[in-house]
């Protein structure tokens, strides 16, 4: 498959994989801001990320990648910040300094404390080193540890969403992680009532509903 495209076309292009929580974050941001984009699937199971053409777009061979004219951006956080700078409505960061810091903290916990411990590249590396039971324990421990920190961080400042009654940056990172906890990893959410409540709130929003893994162009017919 060729991933080389005309960078000078106006329409945004998102290189994505349906189950990637990192790509999921960007899909929410694009939809929340009402931006039209072309979805270009990168099948991580088949190794499309190692394709030489795709690596011209992202030398790391990961998703997501965003192409905006002659601009190419990799990494979900960088992409979302770029979109928020270029398309500032609705804003993804609150004006309140404390709430802004909480958004950054929650985002960091997801990016560094949870997601890296459960991604496909890691488990491919560990495939012959741990069994299925150990893999499940690894994932559960990483998510539980991160969710415990998030619950404590957000319980006192949360409204309908992570830092109030408006959707901000933290919500874009929390939603995919909580969705995966419920639907993919089957984590017991009883110890995390605040996060479970967010999940219900996110499911009411079209931008979040349309971004879920189960509704993407490359979602398999059977999961």
Swiss-Prot record:
It holds the Pfam family GST_N_2. Its EC number is 2.5.1.18. It is an enzyme of class 2 (transferase). PROSITE patterns: GST_CTER (PS50405), GST_NTER (PS50404). It comes from the Eukaryota. Glutathione binds at residues 20-25, 49-50, 62-63, 75-76, 115, 119-121. It is found in: Cytoplasm, Cytosol. It catalyses: RX + glutathione = an S-substituted glutathione + a halide anion + H(+). Keywords: Cytoplasm, Detoxification, Transferase. GO terms for molecular function: glutathione transferase activity. One of its GO terms (biological process) is aromatic amino acid metabolic process. Residues 10-91 form the GST N-terminal domain. NCBIfam families: maiA. Belongs to the GST superfamily. Zeta family. May be involved in the conjugation of reduced glutathione to a wide number of exogenous and endogenous hydrophobic electrophiles and have a detoxification role against certain herbicides. This is Glutathione S-transferase Z2. It comes from Arabidopsis thaliana (Mouse-ear cress).
